[in-house]
Amino acid sequence: MKKTRSTTLRRAWPSSDFSDRASDRMRSRSEKDYRLHKRFPAAFAPQASRGYMTSGDVSPISMSPISQSQFIPLGEILCLAISAMNSARKPVTQEALMEHLTTCFPGVPTPSQEILRHTLNTLVRERKIYPTPDGYFIVTPQTYFITPSLIRTNSKWYHLDERIPDRSQCTSPQPGTITPSASGCVRERTLPRNHCDSCHCCREDVHSTHAPTLQRKSAKDCKDPYCPPSLCQVPPTEKSKSTVNFSYKTETLSKPKDSEKQSKKFGLKLFRLSFKKDKTKQLANFSAQFPPEEWPLRDEDTPATIPREVEMEIIRRINPDLTVENVMRHTALMKKLEEEKAQRSKAGSSAHHSGRSKKSRTHRKSHGKSRSHSKTRVSKGDPSDGSHLDIPAEREYDFCDPLTRVPREGCFIIEHKGDNFIMHSNTNVLESHFPMTPEWDVSGELAKRRTEMPFPEPSRGSSHSKVHRSHSHTQDRRSRNERSNKAKERSRSMDNSKGPLGASSLGTPEDLAEGCSQDDQTPSQSYIDDSTLRPAQTVSLQRAHISSTSYKEVCIPEIVSGSKEPSSACSLLEPGKPPESLPSYGELNSCPTKTATDDYFQCNTSSETVLTAPSPLGKNKEDHDTLTLAEGVKKLSPSDRQVPHSSREPVGHKEESPKGPGGGPAASGGVAEGIANGRLVQHHGAEPSSLDKRKEIFSKDTLFKPLHSTLSVNSYHKSSLSLLKSHPKTPADTLPGRCEKLEPSLGTSAAQAMPASQRQQESGGNQEASFDYYNVSDDDDSEEGANKNTEEEKNREDVGTMQWLLEREKERDLQRKFEKNLTLLAPKETDSSSNQRATHSARLDSMDSSSITVDSGFNSPRTRESLASNTSSIVESNRRQNPALSPAHGGAGPAFNFRASAEPPTNEAEKLQKPSNCLQASVTSV
């Protein structure tokens, strides 16, 4: 197009070339006309200038050319002169320049000193030359590349290399020569000498600090010790700005050092402004990399990572009890637990795995997503991962005393001696784990998870905990009811494990609860932990079944002494018998267990004092009672026990009841009514609420767990249940008879159990007032606690408050009798400690599943953390206040010094177990 246009133009303007026209336009009209006339004859001029109106133009002006040589600006001459002098290694000063100009340009007038100075300053501003103490130097293409980065000191940019002016003379760039950076030039030195002086001094200072060449001082490289840390920081901030702007700050070098302070302050301000968003550390030294690696710029690379120190501090704030020592203890404990778990699994895992896997599957089905997804929680109630022997590792809280986290399964061994089931505390296990009281599983937990859940369930193992964590929130959100049920199951399992003896952990409360809820679900789900009271689980199932058939009846799982044939429950109780020998949950389920289980749970809830104690504790305790009380239960006339149990015995409950472990079913019939009178308003309709009942049981079990010997609680519960139950169905005399029969065997267990039951009753009475923070953590748990209270109230209303009070008194009397008769073989201290541990673990489990897992309201992570911390603090304070609660105490006193020792825990229990007074009672018993 340009060519066409040009040709067109030429056609349009034949009188002139396109190039001529371009220049002509820049000339005056007169000149243009003059040239036109000059080139073309006058005749053609008008035609030639079609585009111009010549009529009004000025007539051509005669111009005389002036002869003169080519003009060269003084600046260029000075540059040439400076370059030549630099090449000649001559110092370039103003005087030397004048001489050089005079010599080299003889015909040219020499500029005055003022003009020369001004021109030099202009050249410096234009960055054509730069002043140095040794004179001016021409700026060459290599100057800015070779010169070291500027150092800004005292708001002045100094060239480190200028310190050595000879080297910095790059006018004729010498190889290896470091020319002062252009900044020198930028800073126009009106008086180069003054500038040199000021600069030189500064440079000397800088130079003294370090070698000029080695220290490549870029704005960000302000590693110069000469630069104070603030300066060091400032240059980085201003590095970009300064590098850009320094060329314009020609005057800065001339500024005296007086401005250094101001410049530093200014630089700091700029630095702060520029790095407001970043965490700025003032570093004395910089590496070549500007934001030094030391700077905690976590936002960019790994925004999620929290420094270990910060993380630990957060953890400490959340859980003050969490210390390195505790963590170490916990780690060691976890290792031991895993080893024991492996050994135990070798011993009895094959049988237990089959039954437990079935049970766990059923339990998962019943619980749905949350439980099935969080295997760790499943393992609590029904170890899905394997036998309950494995559960201690999976769920230490359930099976371990809260203090020691020792798997209670391992803690207690039940012996079948004659007609009595004797529970021995596995001192080795306890001792090995007793010192370990970590409340926190740091074994494999992520720090983040640790922060979220300061009290993870250590027994589950890191993998389980991780699974639980990953699924727990989602699943908890999905099914809070399930989760709360499971949480209560956990607390129950912990309570049960505590309740029976702490060894009663044999039947994880969940297992027991599962037994109850799973009575409907799966048969042959009874589990026996080799060293634990897994048979107690069957007993629990029996009791659950008993309560299911007629929670009133079930509440007093009396063992029919007549039928001593080890029923499934008996088999469960029998240490030697494999889980297969235990009555399958199906058998138990075949009993009116659904209803009984619901009733059982409801009994626990409604008659938290008596029934609840028997139910939660009753499961395990009855297991224990069945174990320790097996004798007494067996002593009970089979007819007495069977009569009450007949309703739930139908499905092999009688078999269980004939045996000590099966004693739970013993007076269930009569007692069930009694319980119904007081609090055991049957919740038969609550089969779906079996989980809720289980939750209730958990809460109550938690209350009962603390009862030092859940066995005694079970015995006491059995007796007390008998008493209570006697009101509705069986005559109180019959129940007391049973209770008395049980008392000899249950004496020990019941002795402890009675205080527990009393506390359970008391807590049952106070249940509404008390609230289990752990169970409450789940809204469902709190609701369940309220429901339990309501159920208890309903039951009480059904029976009448007076009747309930009478029942409570009877229970207390039975408890006292049991306390007198209490001859629990397992050290009471161990039981107490086990129960305490179980209670604590139950709380932690309940908290873990309920309060910690849930993300809203009470279940918010922060709330859960605070609850966990509060619980831990409460537990610890209670332990300190109540030596009986301390692991060292180990329940030295009767487990049922709970009243005395359990009262501090009662506060704790109240907090932990406010939803259910039963929980409170168990904590109190702890």
From Swiss-Prot:
One MF term in the entry's GO annotations = DNA-binding transcription factor activity
- The biased composition feature labelled Basic and acidic residues covers 18-32, 379-391, 473-495, 632-658, 785-799
Which top-rank group of organisms is this from?
A: Eukaryota
Q: Which GO terms describe its biological process?
A: embryo development ending in birth or egg hatching; maternal placenta development; regulation of transcription by RNA polymerase II; response to bacterium
Region Disordered, as annotated, extends over 1-32, 338-391, 452-529, 564-588, 632-672, 724-803, 825-926
Recorded hits in InterPro entries, A to Z, give: Storkhead-box_winged-helix, STOX1/2
- Gene Ontology cellular component annotations, sorted alphabetically: cytoplasm; nucleus
- Which Pfam family, any one, appears in the UniProt record? Stork_head
Q: Where is the composition biased (Polar residues)?
A: 518-529, 746-769, 847-884, 914-926
Specify residue ranges for compositional bias: Basic residues: 353-378, 463-472
> What name appears for this protein in its UniProt entry?
Storkhead-box protein 2
Organism whose genome encodes this protein: Homo sapiens (Human)
Gene designation: STOX2
